[in-house]
Amino acid sequence: MTTRLAVLILLLTAFGYASIAQQKQEEPTIPTATQWTLDAAGPVQRAAIGSVFLMHCPNARSKGTGFLLKNGLVVTNAHVVAGCDAQQMVAMPSSSGSAVHFSKMVKDEAVDLALLRPTEPQKGGLELGPEQDPQVGTSVSTWGYPLTYNGPSPLLSVGYVAGFNKEQQQPGSKAVKHLIVNGAFNPGNSGGPLFLSKDNKVMGVVVAKFHLYPPQVKNAITALSNSKSGFMYNATDEHGNAIQVTEAQVVAMVLEQFYVTTQVMIGEAISLSELKAFIASKETELR
């Protein structure tokens, strides 16, 4: 009897260890860098990090930021998803290494907003704030993936509301209300949530930053890009195809990259009223 009892105890112990090991394997692991960020962030900011995604479109080789709402949908800019359909878009949450895929997408280029429905329900999500504009001088922040930074956790950018503007994304389109922020918004931050620094309720969507170049300089760069004369060089386009470019086009590429990456501490965010109106008009299309 004693021997049988000992064997039974050993079997139960082994089964318990195996069950614990299996549970540990099934639990998603948080990347070390993300855990450092979570540990260092305050409780308000920490709650937002897990709902901010790195948005990537392999087909168009574009990237930006997106965020999960409480209703289960993901918001980003229309220009972040340009050239891709829902099935081609991939989102990487900071809370795990598991990619998020999408089944449906709607967008409005005039407002520069897009809504995507994940194929699998996602935990968490951010709330939209009150539709009252923040006062000039109010501290705001955003989490995102600027420039060539690809994570695993988003980076924090902070600033202050400096004013408001009406922006037309396309000729003849309606004017869209933007918040002007004196914050470091860079390519890659596009589509990220704009928060009041005191809480994690969404007050807008990061969309652009101001640049140094006046229109005449941009026109000169465009002319260089269209030049077909001069020395020819072998290069690779954004899709990996071999191409030939002229000397003038190489100069234009360098100037364009400088234009994109030059740090200017003024950015823009689509207002909350525009975001709410967009969601209300498009949400039913994702059901």
Residue ranges, per PLM feature:
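Conserved active-site neighborhood of the chymotrypsin/trypsin-like protease fold
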Residues: V52, N59-K63, G72-G151, A184, ...
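Conserved hydrophobic positions within beta-strands
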Residues: L68, F102-K104, V161
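C-terminal segment of classical bacterial N-terminal signal peptides
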Residues: A14-I20
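A cytosolic small-molecule/anion-sensing beta-strand core signal
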Residues: L69-K70, K198
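C-terminal subregion of chymotrypsin/trypsin-like serine protease catalytic domains
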Residues: L196-R287
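N-terminal activation segment of mature serine protease catalytic domains
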Residues: A21-L68, V74, V111-L113, Y259, ...
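Flexible, gly/ser-rich surface segments that form the specificity/activation loops bordering the active-site cleft
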Residues: G124-I180, F185-P193, V206-A220
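Sec-dependent N-terminal signal peptides
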Residues: L5-T13
